[in-house]
From Swiss-Prot:
A motif (Nuclear localization signal) lies at residues 76-78. Its EC number is 5.6.2.4. The gene is E1. PROSITE patterns: SF3_HELICASE_1. ATP binds at G432, P433, P434, N435, T436, G437, K438, S439. It comes from Human papillomavirus 25. Residues 587-604 have a biased composition (Polar residues). HAMAP family: PPV_E1. This is Replication protein E1. Phosphorylated. Sumoylated. Residues 406-556 form the SF3 helicase domain.
Amino acid sequence: MADPKGSTSKEGFNDWCILEAECSDIDNDLEQLFDQDTDSDISDLLDENDVEQGNSRELFHLQECQESEEQLQKLKRKYLSPKAVAQLSPRFESISLSPQQKSKRRLFAEQDSGLELTLTNEAEDVSPEVEVPALNSQPVAEGQSGDIDISYTALLRASNNKAILMAKFKEAFGVGFNDLTRQFKSYKTCCNAWVISVYAVHDDLIESSKQLLQQHCDYVWIRGIGAMSLFLVCFKAGKNRGTVHKLMTTMLNVHEKQILSEPPKLRNVAAALFWYKGSMGSGVFTYGSYPDWIAHQTILGHQSAEASTFDLSDMVQWAFDNNYLDEADIAYQYAKLAPDNSNAVAWLAHNNQAKFVRECASMVRFYKKGQMKEMSMSEWIYTKIHEVEGEGQWSTIVQFLRYQQVNFIMFLAALKDLLHSVPKRNCILFYGPPNTGKSAFTMSLIKVLKGRVLSFCNSKSQFWLQPLSECKIALLDDVTDPCWVYMDTYLRNGLDGHYVSLDCKHKAPMQTKFPALLLTSNINVHNEVNYRYLHSRIKGFEFPNPFPMKADNTPQFDLTDQSWKSFFTRLWHQLDLSDQEDEGENGESQRAFQCSTRSANEHL
């Protein structure tokens, strides 16, 4: 009998028949399938609710921070080892000014969950103890580097690098840096000489600096011992600390923290001997001659062998020879001689400088006044015109007088009587409208003959005529009516050329004659009846024309000292001024005036 359709009878597969699904035509119904699908166990697989964006930027920022932290930890592990400072400089690590407590902190962050943390990754602020060899108190030999630890990295990280540099300087040179220098607190204070100590400079740069500094300095002193280099430089112009540091950092390629700079001690013999004896060493480079402050304290010369006492007569002789009469000029000019003149140095070191200056000025005025009184007018004019340098044209004066319609022959005759103090011919008046050159003409003559000028504004003082006793020729400028009244009342005898009693300050009234007197005024005294007693005592010349000027606003007639020098030289015989000068030139030789205690044969 055949097997039923859809089944196979085989041994060992009986269970399959039990599990075989039953077929039905109902499975082909699509509506029933969809209805059953809605009742499935995975009906909530898809979320059909509205979607919210959330804070994505905060998440992105958190991820970036984690990446940065990981990179930072890698760099710390690579470059910031706890033993890095000790490996760079054990000696620097051993230096401690105060005890430090050990404080532990976590140097590297952990990447695990935070459990089972140990102290293996904790680093101490203070490095472990390092065995440091004993320091040798003896300076290192010149040019010998040895096993010097040039820990410039530790120097830059030190809190007080100046103290470390000073310690290394004293260790190298055997003398303190402050023993050779004086302190400038300001960086803007200028000085010509500077002491510079530089740490950890390459040898090639030191050699090159020996040549480069020569163009900036008059004197260079360089010495290198170990890692320290010492410079003494005297610049051609004053420099402040900032400029010096800028020059040295550029030239030596170093950091400013590696430099110590202060000006040297100028009045310390021990410091001067350090530089003087050091320049004789084999490892020292020097350029130029010794500065004055080193030479004066270490080198014995004729100036230092002289006595250091002040000699007032030497100061008076100097002021007399150089025509210094004012106290301010004497003090300033004599102080400028101090570096080369031992007497000026002694004067500066004295406590009574002002007293000596006043006494010197008084003595010079006494000598000059006595010299003037001894000279005649011819000698005086001859002396003063020969002090004028250069040559001029005497025709300028003649042309100006002709321009003002002045008879030159009459003017020459009046000038001759004026210079020889002829009675009642001892005063010349130049009158006319303003701006005609009266003051310019007379002032130029007073200037070349070293005369004095009177001012009537001081007439309330009884000493206003005192300058008449100290000159050979005087000028009273711009005489007005009150001045004419005063002259008509009190000065008739003086204009006559007779002796008068002249009251001088701090002195008894003295007997003297008026010197040659020049007057300028806008009033023609000869036309004034009220002053008829002055007509015979004053010779007048009128200046009617305005003073001519060029297009560039300069005088057309240049009335200079050289013009008057040429005028007197040309008209010397016409003015009858030749006798005294002929005796001076062709007679016996004249000895220069000497007012000091130095003998004439003494060596200069």
